[in-house]
A protein has these predicted regions:
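C-terminal motif of bacterial Sec signal peptides marking the signal peptidase cleavage site
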Residues: 19-23
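Bacterial N-terminal signal peptides that target proteins for export
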Residues: 1-9
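Repetitive helical segments and hydrophobic/amphipathic motifs
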Residues: 12-16
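Subset-of-secretome marker
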Residues: 27-261
């Protein structure tokens, strides 16, 4: 009986030793410390830190940009649009003899502020038709960058400058319907009982900037900006004629307030 008790005690001691050895690694006494390094770019908020993969490759940036625009098409049914155009470096030459000539050409070149609330289902074309149906491609752009900013990713894409943009081709046609081509300017001149023998337009500083959520990659806001420099020769304004008129329209368009279904 005594021998049996001794055997049992010995087994318990041996088992305890095995358990202690097995637990050494868990207590950190024998297992070396491991270091985990993340290669992802981090975007942080004041309360939490989120790991977000910020694309660096141009193709991947454009892909994320297109996905954000598609999000609006699929999930949103309301949004707000603000358009602002200011005219600078206006030179109306001899037409300054007319007291309202400056205001007339600011109007012709599109100066003003416009705010609109859209029901997407009723006004789908305003947003959807402003961009290529198959999405943007890297070859359309001169540059594409992405960076982390608080709880969002800021994607900026830039386009090449162009001369005499039109409604069918070119950089401006890719990003908005809210620009003026020579035909639009010609019509505006007619509305003011005016005309020009030649109209030249140069578009430049063409840029789109999207704020994309780090949570679901939805589009939070979209800003479009560009400049158009107008040079009109042989201008007739009512009874005044023969002057050259030039000016720059600085256009900014903001889409925001997207409401999802």
């Amino acid at each position: 009986m005594k021998n049996n008790i001794i055997r049992i005690v010995s087994l318990i001691i041996a088992l305890a030793a095995v358990v202690q050895l097995a637990s050494c690694g868990k207590n950190g006494e024998t297992e070396p410390e491991k270091t985990v390094t993340s290669e992802r770019t981090k975007a942080s908020t004041s309360s939490t830190e989120k790991i977000v993969e910020i694309p660096e490759d141009k193709d991947e940036i454009v892909k994320m940009f297109n996905a954000a625009l598609d999000f609006v098409d699929v999930y949103c049914y309301k949004y707000k649009k603000h358009v602002k155009c200011s005219v600078s470096d206006l030179n109306i030459g001899s037409l300054s003899a007319a007291s309202n000539a400056g205001d007339a050409f600011r109007n012709i070149f599109g100066e003003g502020n416009f705010d609109t609330d859209y029901d997407y289902n009723k006004s789908k074309d305003d947003f959807d038709s402003s961009f290529p149906k198959s999405g943007f491609t890297p070859d359309m752009l001169t540059d594409a960058t992405a960076s982390a900013e608080s709880d969002r990713i800021i994607i900026t894409v830039r386009f090449p400058s162009e001369s005499n943009p039109d409604k069918e081709n070119g950089s401006l046609r890719l990003i908005t319907n809210d620009f003026k081509d020579s035909e639009t300017v010609k019509k505006s001149l007619t509305d003011f009982n005016s005309s020009a023998s030649s109209i030249s337009i140069n578009a430049y500083d063409i840029e789109m900037k999207a704020a994309v959520s780090t949570v679901d990659r939805s589009l939070l806001s979209l800003d479009i900006s560009f400049k158009e420099r107008y040079t009109l020769s042989g201008v007739k304004l009512v009874e005044l004629e023969g002057s050259t008129v030039s000016g720059i329209s600085n256009v900014s368009i903001n889409y925001s307030g997207f409401v999802t279904q």
